[in-house]
Regions:
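Conserved metal-binding segment of the jelly-roll/cupin
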Residues: 189-205
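A short hydrophobic beta-strand segment most commonly corresponding to one strand
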Residues: 167-173, 196-198, 212-230
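Asparagine-centered strand-capping/turn motif at beta-strand->loop junctions
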Residues: 206-211
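A short beta-strand-loop-beta hairpin characteristic of the jelly-roll/cupin
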Residues: 172-193
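A short glycine-rich, His/Asp/Glu-containing loop-to-beta-strand
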Residues: 131-151
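Non-heme Fe(II)/2-oxoglutarate
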Residues: 2-135
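Conserved short histidine dyad/triad with adjacent acidic residue
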Residues: 145-163
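Long, compositionally biased interface segments
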Residues: 220, 226-246
Length: 246
């Protein structure tokens, strides 16, 4: 089956499901997590690995218009990303990592050992984006990238991890109408501009940009501090209240 028809079939299967249809209720032992360090850690781990949550919006403000302006100004510096995997119009540029044009994981390239991840030359050209990232609740960064999906572009059906579970953070710098992120058993992600979401990239997913504008997101890999753990717990509590209310 060729790639397009495979995606079409996948989209039809996704559209049979609401995004949060199959999330799990919070276990009773985590009810008193607030103010309890160990419970906060345990509850956040449960959310990431066992809640069956496809994406979780965190309450982190984003200067989306400033970041979008910097990204679009530097769009000529973006390179094709994973274009040998059936993707089309998928571009990327690294602001923190090995180098601006090294958009895959370090072991994709021919390094003998993991190189230093640091601010790239692109960071100097995107000072507002860098300043926001420096205030982000993260203990350290690995790869931080701009991701662009051009008008008419497609991110082919794939998954990034073998196991389900919330993992990387995806930030919607913009998200044009008619650009949809389809997820296995979870419909589409209800993106709004400025959303910061933990994403389950162990699910099969695909993105199709049927708009006339480039879709600009950021993907953040790093070490999360306690603020991210607390945000995870607070966000899942709020999601649960909305989803399981009777």
């Amino acid at each position: 089956m060729h790639g397009e028809s495979r995606i079409e079939e996948f989209i039809k299967s996704c559209n049979r499901h609401e995004h949060y249809a199959y999330i799990q209720p919070r276990p009773a032992q985590y009810a008193a997590w607030r103010g309890n360090h160990n419970l906060t850690v345990e509850y956040s781990e449960w959310v990431w690995k066992q809640s069956n949550c496809p994406s979780l919006k965190l309450n982190i403000p984003v200067p989306a218009l400033d970041i979008l302006e910097e990204a679009l100004t530097n769009l000529s510096r973006f390179v094709s990303h994973r274009d040998n995997e059936g993707n089309s119009g998928w571009l990327s540029a690294t602001i923190h990592g090995v180098d601006t044009h090294f958009t895959n994981a370090w072991n994709y390239y021919n390094f003998e050992s993991e190189p230093t991840h640091t601010w790239t030359a692109l960071a100097d050209l995107c000072p507002k984006t860098k300043a926001w990232l420096e205030s982000f609740p993260c203990t350290s960064y690995q790869r931080v990238r701009f991701m662009c999906l051009e008008p008419g572009g497609v991110i082919a059906l794939h998954r990034d991890n073998a196991e389900r579970g919330l993992d990387a953070i995806n930030v919607a710098i913009n998200n044009p109408a008619n650009c949809n992120f389809y997820m296995e058993d979870a419909g589409t992600i209800p993106w709004r501009v400025g959303d910061v979401r933990l994403i389950d990239i162990g699910r099969y997913h695909a993105v199709v940009n049927n708009s006339d504008a480039p879709r600009i997101h950021m993907i953040i890999h790093g070490g999360w501090n306690m603020e991210i753990l607390k945000q995870t717990c607070e966000s899942y509590d709020e999601l649960s209240r909305l989803h399981f209310q009777h």
